[in-house]
Amino acid sequence: MSFNDNLPKLKPFKRSVSIIGVGATPFVRILDDPSVDGMNEQELFAYAARDAMKDAGVDGSDVEFYIHGQAGPGWTSNLATPNMHVANWIGMKGKGSYHHSEACATGYVGVETAVALVASGEYDMVLSGCIETPYSIAYPTRVVTKRRFGTDAIFHDVLASTQCRDYTLFTRGSLPFNSESWLDYYVKENGISEEDVDAMMTALSVNCRRAAALNPLSTITNNTYEELAATNGMDSAYEYLHSKFNPLIGKYMRGSHFEQRCDGAAAIIVCPTELAYKYTDHPIEILGIGHSNVEAGNPRNEMYATQNAYRQVKELTGLTGADMDIFLANDFYNQSEFLSAETCE
């Protein structure tokens, strides 16, 4: 039996659940921008939460429970229980909450958890928000309005903390190669040249950067790669992305294939679909959420986890990627975005 043979089948929700409000902060770099210097995690979470409340036409007195997501709050914020520190900011003092952290999957699990609480009938209105401040880190014993830049050594420790370190398993999860393992398999399985892989990854970088430059909430990415190329005396984005400014950091990965670190937060509010039209004329019904955990000690872990989660929702809803009008994918690594699109048909 492989670890894929034991995947449970999703069951329909006990009652339908819909999103009635969404909110987000601008995505900033606190230490680089004097206009937001001194902002802290609580303010960012509250900004997104209040924005979602405003979108739904509710306030903290209406929301019954909130969920706080942050990937690794111990290293960026020196907070062990960050959910405890935002209730006063959003008008929910005394109400229930909890915190969760699942690295790149934190946002997805935040949606799943909020939906489960409402679908079960335990609560009628739940807010779920996620906040990240990875561009800088807090001091261990100072107020959180004072921050500092991390070092490469600190970030290496953080990345190592995402790996299984049982006995010799740690040696099988070396970054960034654990993220490239599925891509290398895909390339060899389909007889793709390294030049074609590079062209695909470069095009993804260019398109993602262009989308970020157009996004009004992005305050950190104002220039496309074409503009950066011109600024540095180069003729094209392709030339810039194959220069010293974008070195290889793996077999296929370059610097631009990795995330752009910034500070920000986003939130949603969910309630039973039967109540949703009381708050909005365009609720977003959630049909199902797949979930699979495959840690980096397993070869091609991202590929198997994505396949598993997609298979769950496909079997539950009868829908495939071909039925979708819009498809959004995690692009913490470019190859993750490509993997999701390939897997979800």
Which residues does each predicted region cover?
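Phosphate/pyrophosphate-binding loops at sites that engage ATP/ADP/AMP, CoA/4′-phosphopantetheine
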Residues: 50-64, 186-195, 278, 309-323
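Condensing-enzyme catalytic core mediating Claisen C-C bond formation in acyl metabolism
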Residues: 2-42, 156-165, 169, 188-192, ...
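Active-site-proximal alpha-helical scaffold in enzymes
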Residues: 98-132, 173-221, 268-274
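Short, well-ordered amphipathic alpha-helical segments that serve as non-catalytic structural scaffolds
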Residues: 41-57, 82, 110, 179-182, ...
